[in-house]
């Protein structure tokens, strides 16, 4: 296996013997003074077909979190009845790192979709619960059980849909509303969002969950009043933007967004804008 790009000391982008691009992980495989050829014994894990947008996560996420997420992705592939995308380990790692950050910041958020996920996707929810239990053991933090729904959603959203399948009317509407919501964020937060970036893909995935929840029959959850109040006061522009995005969603789909959902949406908007915010723009 030949190295074509060293990502960090323990990760490299390679070409295998069949000419396919692959990400190789292993202790020291990306060391600058190392060899350009890797032996199988040097490699602990490989990933084929991963979108290049996800590669920066290898430098941003704790290797222990990434390894845990990779194991969870392996378990999911063996248990669900549908094909999962090549990026799953990376999207799970990003989501789990965000959970850990929120727990460490004492920001416990009720997942707005938890009830629906638990009953509509029992296997994925079970995987989420097992992941929460293991995270408590591995990372020594009190992860709330409600986070199981978010992990389940990360698995569900990774489902591979045949490219030959024509877009339904609802899918086209989702695309239109997603574009509208993105333009609202760009205008109100005064940023330019790269629609080819991983950060945008993460934001778009969250909006898709909201579209499904609002257009369905499930009632929104309430709670987290203290956190909602804190977000309004500390990030007034972000929360106001979330409210406008929420109005765009409910105008298109009906229903309403609970304050819990606005809070979670605010966190995603803030996260999306962190790296691209214009100089001098406060949130």
List each language-model region with its residue ranges:
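A cross-family "folded-core" feature that marks the main globular domain of proteins
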Residues: 1-283
């Amino acid at each position: 296996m030949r190295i074509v790009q060293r990502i960090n000391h323990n990760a490299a982008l390679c070409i295998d013997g069949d000419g396919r691009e692959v990400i190789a992980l292993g202790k020291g495989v990306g060391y600058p003074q190392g060899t350009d050829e890797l032996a199988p014994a040097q490699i602990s894990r490989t990933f084929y077909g991963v979108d290049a947008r996800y590669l920066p996560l290898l430098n941003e996420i704790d290797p222990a979190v990434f390894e845990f997420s990779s194991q969870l992705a392996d378990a999911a592939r063996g248990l669900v009845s549908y094909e999962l995308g090549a990026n799953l380990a990376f999207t799970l790692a990003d989501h789990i790192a965000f959970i850990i950050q929120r727990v460490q910041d004492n920001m416990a958020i009720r997942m707005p979709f938890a009830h629906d996920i638990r009953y509509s996707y029992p296997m994925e929810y079970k995987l989420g619960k097992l992941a929460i239990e293991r995270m408590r053991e591995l990372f020594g933090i009190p992860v709330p059980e409600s986070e199981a729904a978010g992990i389940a959603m990360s698995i569900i959203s990774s489902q591979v849909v045949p490219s030959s399948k024509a877009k339904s009317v609802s899918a086209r509407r989702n695309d239109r509303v997603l574009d509208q919501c993105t333009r609202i964020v760009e205008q109100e937060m005064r940023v330019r969002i790269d629609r080819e970036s991983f950060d945008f893909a993460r934001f778009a995935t969250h909006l898709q969950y909201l579209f499904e929840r609002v257009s369905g029959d499930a009632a929104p959850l309430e709670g987290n009043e203290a956190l909602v109040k804190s977000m309004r006061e500390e990030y007034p522009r972000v929360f106001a933007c979330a409210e406008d995005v929420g109005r765009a969603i409910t105008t298109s789909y009906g229903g309403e967004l609970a304050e819990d959902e606005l809070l979670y949406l605010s966190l995603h908007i803030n996260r999306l804008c962190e790296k691209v915010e214009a100089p001098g723009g406060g949130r």
